[in-house]
Amino acid sequence: MRIFSLALGFLPLVAGHTLMTTLYVDGENQGDGVCIRMNRNAEKATFPISPLANDAMACGYDGEIAAARTCAVSQSSTLTFEFRAYPDGSQPGSIDGSHKGPCAVYMKPVANATSDNNAAGDGWFKIYELDYDSSTSQWCTEKLIANNGFLSVQIPEGLRGGDYLVRTELLALHAAQDSPPDPQFYVGCAQVFLEGSESGDVPEGVVIDASTYSLDVPGLTYNIYTEPLELPYPSFGPSVYQPNASASTENAKVSGTQATQKDGLQPEGCILVRDDWCGYEVSSYSDEAGCWAECWTQADECWGTYLPTGNKNCQIWQDKCTEIDTQCSAGNWNGPPNKGKVLTPELEGVGGSMKVFSGGVSSADSEGSGSGIDEAETEMNTSQGAAFTSTPAAETAVAADATATATATTEDAEATTAAEAAATSGAGRPGRGHGHGRGPEVYADITVYDDNDHLSNIRPVISCCKVNLGPNDSFLRAARFAPIFSGSHGLRIDYSDTHYWLIAWPVNVVSFDQCLPQPQGSAPETSRTAIHLFAFSRAALSPYTCYLHLHIIEFTISAAFDQNDAEES
């Protein structure tokens, strides 16, 4: 028997990270992951940027990797961004309600949005910001949640036509007052081509890179729990760009050379879109050899390359291949059937209001564009973070304080990716198994799984922490551990070749009549905030529904079991 003891505590749920997944142009859905730069690691895609001194502050992790597509937009188009706690949309939600804080949107002109390594650096100008709206007593993130995860902005008129990166920035302040402070930035970028004159406005920009943010900026250590709040909120960064109304109108009417999109267009012949991937019609065939040739090669590529937004459309392509197989097996070697039929499903529209949130500042304000911003709130922000700098060639960015590295949260720094837990979407491809242990090691990975389908659809949602399973020194190395836990049954720990489940419920918080069937035995008499954890092997676990909302900072698990016997609990 091996004693498994983790020194771990607990708090109510404050987990629930987020990712910007989808762009809508004037209400038209461009498709999940289309024209979006995002973290390509599905297990960490929703994580905040850490530490603050990080070039990922520009467009997020993997934000220097360009998307294949650039979406066309018009002067004064409304851009709507969708944020999801589950990037593939498998469960609802945008960001946890505890994650209160401001929002901002920036733009940056680039020579080619589909080129890599053009995010961090100068050229960024702000077109929208909203922190705390005193008229509604809401933070921007609260308005985002109330609007089903949709944030809209209007492009200012008169900008020079061409390629741009559009950067969304959410700042969660729920742990900003901690020691050390832990402000959590969630940033992402869309690639757009702005139609218009090549002689339009080019706003002065600022640098966004590893030097931009530090704990010296007051807005990053703001205490949202102070009553009453200390208002106004100390906004940071550059003022929102406000074009001269008359100049913008004239620039918009310039009849000179109009910018023409050359890069990032949807490839000709693409009949199925899945984020950066396109499926192309197979070549016509008239014999048995040609009948089997091409379809499954594309299917394998679709299943093997999808972004965190999911692989839903891969099943559509697989169905096409199966239909071809059926025809081939029947001796019908003339095809393909339904040649050239577009398979991309019709996309849903914006699932919330497209009105720009009131209470903030927008570049569109000065143009009377009807953006929905309160008239009283149109003054430019004058409280700027010192780490932001304008970008004329003679100027350089102010270096961030070296202590910014101390703000790294261990949930990312100590996170370990479980190599065999790659099937994060839970959808369709035959033979895609669930993750399991790496074999006997001194250090074993902990992977947190979300299971809402009674063990039938197990999804790894976060890999975190290494546990020393040595006989004399068992401990959890990570101090913070925040799984996405809405509607989950428990934690699964993968160790060796067995799966051990830890089932938790809050005593006197979630009533047992919400857990069907009830766990055997009666709950111990303990305090209201206590969490009781029970270790089960996979075989010993009887599925039951008990919806828990937990944020596990530290907790204590003590269980004795034979690591080679998955039937013991």
From Swiss-Prot:
A GO cellular component annotation in the UniProt record: extracellular region
Signal peptide span: 1-16
Pfam families, A to Z: AA9
Record keyword Ligase present: no
Residues involved in Cu(2+) binding: H17, H99, Y186
GO biological process: cellulose catabolic process
GO MF annotations, alphabetized: metal ion binding; monooxygenase activity
EC nos: 1.14.99.56
Coiled-coil residue spans: none
Cofactor(s) it depends on: Cu(2+)
Biased composition annotated in UniProt, kind: Low complexity: 399-424
Keyword set, alphabetical order: Carbohydrate metabolism, Cellulose degradation, Copper, Disulfide bond, Glycoprotein, Metal-binding, Monooxygenase, Oxidoreductase, Polysaccharide degradation, Secreted, Signal
Location of this chain's protein in the cell: Secreted
Region (Disordered): 399-439
Enzymatic reactions: [(1->4)-beta-D-glucosyl]n+m + reduced acceptor + O2 = 4-dehydro-beta-D-glucosyl-[(1->4)-beta-D-glucosyl]n-1 + [(1->4)-beta-D-glucosyl]m + acceptor + H2O
Keyword Cytoplasm attributed: no
Binding site for O2: H174, Q184
Family the entry assigns: Belongs to the polysaccharide monooxygenase AA9 family.
General function of this protein: Lytic polysaccharide monooxygenase (LPMO) that depolymerizes crystalline and amorphous polysaccharides via the oxidation of scissile alpha- or beta-(1-4)-glycosidic bonds, yielding C4 oxidation products. Catalysis by LPMOs requires the reduction of the active-site copper from Cu(II) to Cu(I) by a reducing agent and H(2)O(2) or O(2) as a cosubstrate.
Identification of the protein by name: AA9 family lytic polysaccharide monooxygenase A
